[in-house]
Amino acid sequence: MAKNLGLPVLEIQHHYAHILSCMAENETSDPVIGVSFDGTGYGTDGTIWGGEFLRADYNGFDRIGSVEPFLQVGGDASAREGWRIAVSILYRHTRDREKTKRMASALQLCDAQNLQAQFLLSDRNINTVVSTSAGRLFDAVSAILGIRRTSTFEGEASTALQFAAQNGRIRRGQTNASDRPLREENGRFVLPTEELVWELAQRKLRGEDSEQLALEFHEALAAGIIWGCERAREETGLSAAALSGGVFQNTLLLEFCLTGLEERGFRVYRHHMIPPNDGGIALGQAAAAMWVLNRKKE
């Protein structure tokens, strides 16, 4: 509409807007390590983002890290059916149809017909997109652990996974996440989340408790976020981290991240009044526009 009216248009990338909204709420214009974790948003490279580490300020951003890319198969259905993401990650890890078929059957992820369709779409690259969505990882783990294989509303599977983790914490207390070193890929660091999902699937098949595994997933992902911020600090010299995106509505993950980052000397910005999900993006966009307008006046 603005273009049709001949008005200037300022385009702000989705995950960058999340970080700007957190910066605006906390009244800072200093550069930050932005941790933008959510369900879905278009990246600048044509893939789906959602588990991003950004070096960000009001002048722009650089993508310096992410969760491990996976193939999101099935279009919009994959956002509702976490088993699709689970199968995709397991298939990517094994690169073997028969092995993946046995695991998917044992985990009761889907029926044989749907599984064959997943293989076909993946192998022929039909209705697929590369994704780094942290939200979809929650859906995949929820499916693997038998908590929720599908969602009837946004965030159902991931919320159920959080509740399971909280129950596991109450019953058994907190554990310590094992070390999974970061690696380099296409000029950025990558959290080894594929290995994490694979390990959880193996342990579930050995009969380990789903609630305890849900807790360990939260701990491991928080540890990965902390390691990512430490790596970003080494690269950028920044010690301020801004946590935003719908995944940080998960209070358990947020708690683990806040505790770990503050113990390591980070100044952590988080949301208090503005929602971390897409409900807060408009603030980030407006703050960016105000910054640009003020610069033009100077």
Language-model segment annotations:
Residues V32-S36, S131, A242:
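Short glycine-aspartate micro-motif
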Residues D62-D76, K101-A104, S122-I126, F266-H272:
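Short beta-alpha connecting loops at secondary-structure transitions
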